[in-house]
Structures are given as C-alpha cells and as structure tokens.
Design a protein with these regions (language model features):
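Juxtamembrane membrane-water interface segments of multi-pass membrane proteins
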Residues: 1-7, 31, 35, 60-74, ...
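Core segments of alpha-helical transmembrane spans in multipass integral membrane proteins
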Residues: 18-27, 43-65, 76-86
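Hydrophobic core of alpha-helical transmembrane segments in multi-pass integral membrane proteins
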Residues: 18-29, 107-121
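Central hydrophobic cores of alpha-helical transmembrane segments
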Residues: 74-80, 131-135
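Membrane-helix boundary connector in multi-pass membrane proteins
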Residues: 86-104, 121-122
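Membrane-water interface at the C-terminal end of transmembrane alpha helices
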Residues: 110-134, 143
C-alpha cells in the first residue's frame, strides 16, 4: 500500500471514529441503554462521558486533515479506548447485570481503539516539526 492510499484510509478511520464519538455514543446510550448506559442511571455521569467523547471526536475530525502531524492524538484516542474497553469488560464480566455491555460499548471501544492504533503504527516515521537540532546520542553510534 502506498503512502497516499494509507493516508486516505487513515483519514477515513479518523472521520468515522470522530463521528461515532460525537454522535454515536450519545445516540446509542438513548436507543440501547442496556448495551451503552451503565446502571444505576446517572445523568450527570452520562453527560460528562458524552462531553469527553464528543470533544475527542471533534479533535479526531480535525486530525483527519493531517494524520501524520497528529500521531500522538490518534494513538492516545486508540490506546485510551482500548484501556477503557478492557476495564469495562472486566466490570461487565464481574457484574451479571452489566453483561449486555460485552456486546455493546465494550467491543465498540475495543474495535475503534485497535483500528486507530493499527492505522497509525506500521513503521512510519514520526514527523518532527522542530528546527532545533537534536543532540547526538553516543549510545546509538555504530562504528
């Protein structure tokens, strides 16, 4: 896959993930509370959760303009989604009243997280925008 095709896939993943975080989570919490809203219902918690993910979604949409220069944000979104999904998976397994989440928000976050990390990882160089020369590391010299 050439760089242009890869960047097109990255942009697509960022746009879809951003839109899911902005609109999908709030919508699914209303339409399918058993899979996306934890009990007991706490509107304050839900509003904070929706606000944080909507904000992340907006920044993922902005990152789609130039994925290479937003690598840290994309990796944060990916890894934090994986960690969040894993923690919720453990909680859902331990609490029988929350097991529906194992087919709801848990796999949704894990899938989005893995895909975000995958489209960001494979051996691509990190773009350095600083004009300040980096100090030489003697440990990395090859003689």
């Amino acid at each position: 896959m050439n760089e242009e095709t890869r960047e097109r896939y990255q942009r697509g993943v960022l746009i879809v993930s951003g839109l899911v975080f902005i609109f999908g989570i709030a919508l699914l919490m209303r339409l399918w509370p058993a899979g996306f809203a934890w009990t007991p219902r706490q509107p304050e918690y839900e509003q904070m959760f929706i606000g944080v993910y909507a904000t992340l979604g907006i920044f993922l949409l902005l990152a789609a303009r130039a994925p290479a220069t937003n690598r840290s944000l994309i990796l944060f979104a990916g890894w934090s989604s994986i960690v969040h999904g894993a923690i919720m998976a453990v909680q859902a397994v331990r609490d029988p009243t929350e097991q529906t989440h194992l087919v709801g928000d848990v796999p949704a976050l894990l899938i989005i997280g893995v895909v975000l990390v995958m489209v960001t990882q494979p051996g691509r160089q990190f773009v350095v925008t600083s004009r300040v020369p980096l100090p030489e590391n003697p440990a990395l010299r090859t003689h």
